[in-house]
Design a protein with these regions (language model features):
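Short beta-strand
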Residues: 26-30, 56-58
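PLP-dependent enzyme catalytic core of the Aspartate aminotransferase-like
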Residues: 43, 48-57, 61-86
Length: 86
């Protein structure tokens, strides 16, 4: 459980850093094993990540990102950074 909390906090902080790349990418922390992001391009990001073998949950104006291993989270952050930098 401590690993999940640590990985969630790192994922949240990494996503917060990425939010500087887009005004339409608001990150919300949680006490569970996921992080919410509010964005109008959630469907496009969901498809982009799916094409890169990363699965997140698309929920209309939000996406839900489950906490993974440190390596999985790093790959996710790298893909989102690439997407936001296009």
């Amino acid at each position: 459980q401590k690993t999940i909390v640590r990985n969630r906090e790192k994922l949240y902080n990494d996503l917060l850093e990425l939010s500087a790349l887009s005004d339409d990418f608001k990150v919300y922390n949680s006490c569970a094993n996921f992080v919410f992001v509010k964005t109008s391009f959630g469907k496009e990001l969901w498809n982009y990540l799916k094409d890169n073998s990363i699965v997140i949950r698309f929920m209309g104006d939000y996406i839900r990102i489950s906490v993974g291993t440190e390596e999985e989270n790093e790959e996710l952050i790298s893909c989102i950074k690439t997407y936001l930098s296009r």
